């Protein structure tokens, strides 16, 4: 048994340090062997509509590459532009001998039972690489799709942006309209090489009884840029994630922004950590959380290890239900003289004067609250295709209705 397998075996029962603990045996590993689908013909109109809500357009047009995994099977995978490589991770590991060195390098296999399960019972996942100097104008679209009720999906993704390259990935994670429960475990390791740029947009559109456990590590080298956008607007049972970005090279930059809604019965424990290890690195972490009756823990952690670093953390939350709970947990850790780090955190309700101001201009109370909520959740995400931008705007509009 390899050392990695042994570590996974020893940690297979270890609960995560944060978030709601799960019984992994409560979920199923049985599901149909879905056929490969080069033309997306197996997807009914209802499925297509559901996938679009997670940003997945089911077309190879205007995409530099596409990847779709249904349960345990990769059903579509294609690179459509020179300079981009898109493969299932198992195939990529067989093709590139050195890729194994990137596996479990940024995320510890023995972090908890979820990382262990991803190693011991891996389904697949994606490998996406932008070749040196490639300027990839159109996004790569990746979808992780639970199509069978109660299925436990385990994926491991690796993204490499080679020196001087630029890449945008849009990942949609969702379920079949008929699926009510299940578990998604997703390990992701991103490498942004010297002078490279990666924008990663993740949109979740799960079902009400789905549990989600992403585990993400990012390494950004000298002069590199990593932009992360995370959107969760629809009901889910629980999400626990705490991605860590390491700015390892001088002048590296990251911006992490997220918007999420905790619906009744939902438990979210989400956040982001940035470790600034080199001079002139910069980081910005922005979170917008809204509780409609669910529980949300919004975390942020900035670690400045050397002088001449600058970072800001902003956590804002709105509670719109008597049953709603939001915890904002900002942390600043300065380990050297000359760091410049700040945070701003606010949790509360909509001020009465804001509602009165809008009502004085002709809106009724419900319309006024809805308008304020839409403005609170509206965060500009760069590089979205028009159809996806319209769908995201529509989802934000819907989230403000009936409050």
Regions found by a protein language model. Give the residues of each.
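Extracellular glycan-modifying ectodomains
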Residues: 368
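Conserved beta-strand/loop scaffold segments within soluble protein domains that form the structured core
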Residues: 3-10, 104-363, 377-379, 383-403
């Amino acid at each position: 048994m390899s050392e990695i397998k042994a570590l996974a075996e020893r940690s297979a029962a270890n609960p995560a340090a944060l978030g709601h603990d799960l019984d992994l045996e409560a979920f199923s590993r049985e599901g149909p062997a879905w056929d490969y689908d080069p033309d997306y013909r197996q997807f009914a109109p209802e499925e297509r509509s559901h996938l679009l809500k997670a940003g997945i357009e089911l077309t190879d047009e205007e995409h530099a590459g596409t990847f779709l995994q249904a349960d345990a099977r990769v059903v579509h995978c294609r690179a459509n532009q020179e300079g981009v490589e898109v493969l299932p991770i198992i195939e990529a590991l067989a093709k590139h001998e050195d890729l194994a060195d990137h596996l479990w390098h940024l995320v510890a296999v023995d972090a908890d039972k979820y990382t262990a399960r991803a190693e011991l019972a891996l389904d697949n996942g994606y490998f996406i690489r932008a070749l040196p100097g490639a300027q990839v104008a159109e996004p790569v679209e990746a979808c992780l799709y639970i199509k069978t009720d109660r299925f436990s999906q385990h994926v491991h993704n690796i993204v490499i942006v080679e020196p001087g390259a630029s890449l945008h990935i849009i990942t949609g994670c969702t379920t079949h309209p008929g699926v009510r429960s299940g578990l998604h475990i997703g390990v992701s390791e991103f490498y942004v090489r010297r002078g490279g740029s990666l924008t990663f947009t993740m949109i979740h559109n799960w079902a009400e009884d789905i549990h989600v456990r992403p585990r993400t590590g990012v390494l950004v080298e000298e002069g590199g840029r990593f932009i992360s956008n995370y959107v969760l607007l629809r009901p889910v049972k629980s999400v626990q994630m705490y991605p860590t970005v390491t700015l390892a090279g001088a002048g590296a930059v990251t911006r992490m922004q997220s918007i999420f809604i905790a619906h009744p019965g939902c438990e979210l424990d989400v956040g982001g950590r940035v470790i600034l290890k080199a001079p002139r690195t910069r980081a910005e972490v922005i979170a917008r959380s809204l509780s409609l009756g669910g529980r949300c823990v919004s975390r942020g952690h900035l670690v400045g290890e050397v002088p001449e670093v600058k970072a800001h953390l902003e956590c804002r939350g709105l509670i719109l239900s008597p049953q709603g709970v939001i915890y904002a947990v900002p942390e600043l850790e300065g380990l050297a003289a000359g760091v410049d780090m700040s945070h701003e955190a606010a949790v509360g309700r909509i001020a009465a004067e804001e509602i009165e101001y809008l009502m004085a201009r002709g809106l009724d109370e419900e319309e006024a609250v809805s308008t304020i909520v839409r403005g609170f959740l509206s965060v500009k995400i760069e590089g979205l295709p028009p159809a996806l931008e319209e769908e995201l705007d529509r989802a934000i509009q819907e989230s403000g209705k009936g409050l």
